[in-house]
Amino acid sequence: MKQLWLVMFLSVALIGCSDESTPEKLSAADISAGKVVADRECKGCHGLDGKGTAPGIPNLAGQRGRYIMAALKEYKEGTRTHAALRQVAANMSDDETRQVATFYASLRPIQAPKPDQFSAYENGKKVAATCTHCHGENGNSKTPGTPSLAGQQPVYFVNATHEYLTGERKSAPMDPMLRRMNRLDIESAALYFASQMPAERSAPPTGNAAEGEPRTAVCGGCHGSHGVSTDSATPTLAAQDPEYLTQAIKAYRTTRKHPLMSRLVAELSDQEIDNIVAFYTTQKSKPAESGETLLKEITTKCDRCHAGERDNPALAIPIIAGQDKDYLTLALRSYRDGKRGNSMMHNMSLPYGDSIIESLASYYANQPVR
């Protein structure tokens, strides 16, 4: 999730950074003139009090003027894609842009309605409770042929689940449960299981781990040293159920479609597969994520720029505490999906899925305005 997710994030986004260096000068003349511009161009969505008139529309009251100016400039230049706002920005002169930004910056900040705090980890814990009958407590399977999910990489988990849903992978017992899960639930379960400690396993009755280790040299290029993956989209093999791992490897001879894996597996005998499985089964694994503390880790990074008291006059950075949750969600998704041009925010939000974005948006919407 540090690469999936998971945390990230004005109208389609009040989040982002720009190098606009206009100082915050709140002159009375600009405030008065800006109110006239706001009455003409902005009040239908943002009100004259700076409060968004519907969910998904950001509050502008108390927002940094230099950020509002930078956002309007980006709409005017087409860097941000919102048809109505591009037209609004085009209707404003440079003076009017400064004036309306000054007007909204002069208003007392408005606290958006506080939503319920969403926790991807806690939601995943609830979803995972339906999986324990087969996959074991905390995702450590004790059923031969059923994979352990503890410590598994989250993007791989999401992708594998999608393959079951589309029929690319066959598993009749999984089907009814999976079809009750939405994308948010699947991502949440992925985070929860990725954060669990994998149990150690004893050697399986077949295969020789010592003979299998040399054959894993090529495998390690993708699956990591000793089968502990460092790539969120590539599965960890260490401490996996041996019967399941054997079946999964051999499936590349028949039903599974992956050119590289199919070619590599075609070169292996059954005994060599048993040896490889014996090696990976007995390796120690570890959690791929830090689910219970992940949100705190991400928000600590966000606050380096976005905390209200950390205003950098050289950057146009928005205040996000107390902002509308739906707007924050839209903004983060837009950065993640490449629909906004800010490279800094794009790089920050790229790894995060909907469950982490939902957690972040509800977290900041619940913070007091400053």
Could you describe each region identified by the protein language model?
Residues 135, 153-154, 179, 184-188, ...:
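Extended non-catalytic domains of envelope/secretory-pathway proteins
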Residues 35, 51-77, 86-88, 139-165, ...:
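Gly/Gly-Pro-rich "capping" loops immediately C-terminal to redox-active cysteine motifs
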Residues 18-20:
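Bacterial signal peptide processing site
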Residues 2-8:
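Sec-dependent signal peptide recognition
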Residues 66, 74-83, 88-95, 104-115, ...:
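Hydrophobic, ordered structural segments
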Residues 90-112, 179-201, 266-288, 335, ...:
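C-terminal capping alpha-helices of c-type cytochrome domains
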Residues 27-48, 116-140, 152-153, 204-228, ...:
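Sequence/structural segment immediately N-terminal to covalent heme-attachment motifs in c-type
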Residues 14-16:
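C-terminal motif of bacterial Sec signal peptides marking the signal peptidase cleavage site
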